[in-house]
A protein has these predicted regions:
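N-terminal membrane topogenic signal
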Residues: 1-4
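Membrane-embedded helix bundles of polyisoprenyl
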Residues: 6-9, 99-108, 113-188
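Membrane-interface coil-to-helix junctions
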Residues: 9-102, 121-146
Length: 188
């Protein structure tokens, strides 16, 4: 039942994107995310590495820039031929990750199903993450924090190195996602 509730809220919230042909197109998404991800998808479709991005200033190296997320694992979605589908899947994946990881973290803390659902929905609809969604590189980095916290706490309680490794992997995702300051916040 909790999964169904979360799914229903998610579908209602993203109904315009899922069913009405709308897309995410505001603030940094409009100026950076959409054009850079489109360029990344086109270059990868040609079987090349995205060394140079010609559409920023008079051209700039793309791979060393953090915010395009060239080496960020979820960017693999841009290998999908249908760019708009990949773009939506990319953004929706991060919202789903946020909702499910907040729910999982709350349940790990032995909070009630209702409290966990409330925290999960608040993370989706609340001001912090809602405002970060327009600054996509910070958003896609910040959503990993609940998983990092849960893995770190499991490592501290159980002492298993696998949880430490998972926390480190998720921190690396924060860096590769283009928001390295989020990894600093996570470590603190």
């Amino acid at each position: 039942l909790p999964s169904l509730i979360l799914l229903s809220i998610f579908v209602l919230y993203f109904f315009p994107v899922l069913f009405e042909g709308k897309t995410f197109f505001f603030r940094d998404v409009k100026h950076f995310a959409y054009p850079m991800k489109l360029y990344l998808a086109r270059v990868w479709a040609m079987g090349e590495w995205p060394f140079w991005y010609p559409n920023l200033l008079q051209g700039t190296p793309l791979m060393p820039l953090m915010h395009p997320g060239v080496f960020y694992p979820p960017s693999i979605l841009f290998l999908i031929k249908d760019f708009l589908f990949a773009f939506h899947a990319y953004f929706l994946f991060h919202h789903i990750l946020l909702m499910t990881s907040v729910y999982g973290l709350c349940r790990y803390w032995k909070k009630s199903v209702q409290a966990s659902l409330c925290a999960s929905v608040t993370s989706l609809l609340g001001g912090y993450f809602l405002s970060l969604a327009s600054v996509y590189n910070h958003f896609q980095s910040a959503v990993w924090f609940p998983l990092i916290l849960m893995m770190w706490q499991k490592y501290r309680v159980k002492g298993s190195l696998k949880y430490f490794c998972w926390a480190a992997i998720f921190i690396s995702f924060q860096v590769l996602g283009g928001g390295p300051e989020n990894s600093i916040f996570s470590v603190l």
